[in-house]
Amino acid sequence: PAFEKDSCGVGFVMNMKGEKSHEIITQGLEILKKLEHRGACGSDSATGDGAGILIQIPHLFFQKNCTGIKLPEPGRYAVGNIFLPVGEDTKQGQEIMERAVVTEGLELLGWRDVPVDNTTIGKTARSVEPVVKQLFVGAGPDIPDQLAFERRLYCVRKRSAWGIRRAGLNDNNESFYTCSLSSKTLIYKGQLMAPQLETYYLDLKDPNMVSAL
């Protein structure tokens, strides 16, 4: 135990009955803020070394906010939070992700722009701020269960990362990154201080954003 040391702070909150609510997310964000002392910053005191939150996929929230995307029942679609390069490379990054989805025999359902407010983040973080989009992927009729679906999604992540490297989009920075891609959970994260997460990602304030953990 004396050697079990790490610089990261991790907190957990859940509803023991599996009942989803926005309160769980609010409590999770409060835990995150109380762990701010486990993070770090450099000369730019408003740029952190990273903070994030993992929640269950909020089906009702996406039904209300994903206009133009027809979502299957929960468990039969996945959501990915994707960091993409800014400018002309944004579209190319999306196309590489889309090809990986199709190659793995999955259904491309669409994209959603993730609303953010960068007014409180530091200059350093803002200088490397990516485009944040959500990718929606359907399981398709030939995927027998959620476990098989998750395996295909893992392959999508690996194929897209390889495609990005091959295209040279990450030669000068790490602006392409898959935060998460799953039919079960969703991760909101960034180069942020702990208290900045809930102000940066506007989704986290929506009462329809619910989770049991």
Named regions from a protein language model:
Residues 1-213:
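N-terminal segments that mediate ammonia production and transfer
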